[in-house]
Amino acid sequence: MNKAIITVVGQDTVGIIARVCTYLSQHNVNVLDISQTIIDGYFNMMMIVDYANADKDFGAMVGNLEDLGDDIGVRIRCQREEIFTKMHRI
């Protein structure tokens, strides 16, 4: 299993989850866990995904997700789980 953490932050609008999940599904990335909330009109989502069977390499997926975020007006970041964990260790 190759896990990654995807975060999505921005002004809330219709279809954010649908667009992100559609991209992931189209490229054979499995969503393992998802949490989202809206705080005062701002959308926040964190996903744990498995990209082991993805049809794109990790770097291409990261770039595509950033571009998708630009298209829908949010900021999308994707990091390998081990990097995310090391960065957020207390």
Curated annotation (Swiss-Prot):
**What is the protein name given in its UniProt record?**
UPF0237 protein BL1209.1
Q: Which domain of life is it from?
A: Bacteria
Q: What is the lineage of its organism?
A: Bacteria, Bacillati, Actinomycetota, Actinomycetes, Bifidobacteriales
Q: Which cysteines are joined by disulfide bonds?
A: none
Record-annotated ACT domain positions: 5-79
State the PANTHER family in the record: UPF0237 PROTEIN MJ1558
A Pfam family for this UniProt protein?
ACT_6
In the record, the note on similarity to other proteins reads:
Belongs to the UPF0237 family.
